Amino acid sequence: MSHSPLFTSPPKSLCILRLSAVGDVCHALAVVQHIQRHWPQTKLTWIVGKTEMGLLSGIEGVELVPYDKKSGWKGVWNLWMFLKNNQFDALLNMQTAFRASIISLGIQAKYKIGFGKKRSREGQWLFVNRRVQDPETPHVLDGFMAFADYLGVPPAEMLSWQLAISDADREYAKQFIDPTRKNLIISPCSSKAEKDWLVERYAEVANIAHQHNVNVIFCSSPAKRELEMVKKITALCDFQPVDASGKTSLKQLAALIHQANLVISPDSGPAHIATTQGTPVIGLYAYHNPLRTAPYHNLDNVVSVYEENVQKEQGKPSSELPWVTKLKGKNLMAEIQVEQVVAQMRALNLF
């Protein structure tokens, strides 16, 4: 901590503003629970997206206030009315989206804290009166942890996550698991199709795992695009994989991932859920810097073609470029080879 802490004794109340997406909410959870461990008497209120609420509901000692972005101005107004009698010691605005800054206007807090210069976007600096010190390390979670540091919370020796997953959800997830074999989850879809790996390569990896007596499970959200993707992949498999696509809530997915030996996923929520469950994950990256966005604790397991493509597109390494540098090339995920992924599967002792 290279600055004077904002609080020299635990504050009475804090408001956390991080609406989405699932992966970022997993990062924020680590920070919130780190604060909670050091300041157990501090009242914590977290404004979170409606979808992400499905993962966080039930976590101990945190008041969760859901916000549905589809509700527009009416939803913002209702949120303000719900919180109007709250006077927080500080607001941690951990989302740079303009929508989050608008929401922050109606939240009463002595200190409104935002990101530092490198990581602040969409004019967030106009809506805050304090800014954290951006860390030297590029990972998103480290940037979130800077908020705890700014408050005066001691650094974490080891991050941990505690989701409230019920016995019923764990029991439901068991139907997809083979307890006599190792279990591999392939979650093939990200939020954007360009970040997905190739259908035939997912199938090839699944076939290789099956040949090594691994139980292969496919999962996805109920979105039509994702269900169709899984259908195309499984049609190319030499065997009948377990199809859990569209059949789990976020908590049931977390329970399923907890019981698996390994997850393979592009840049997506399930990859970060795996981190919360302590399950190894092989992240597949091309468009975003894995040092910034890969599953925490799993950066060494990544298969990435980002750095070589940064050099091609920008003519310099990612360390010399702006913190968020997304690549623009077409079909970059096609540069990830099956052999690279299989090598990581072996390194992680799947077979």
Annotate each predicted stretch with a short phrase.
Residues 1-351:
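Catalytic machinery of carbohydrate-active enzymes
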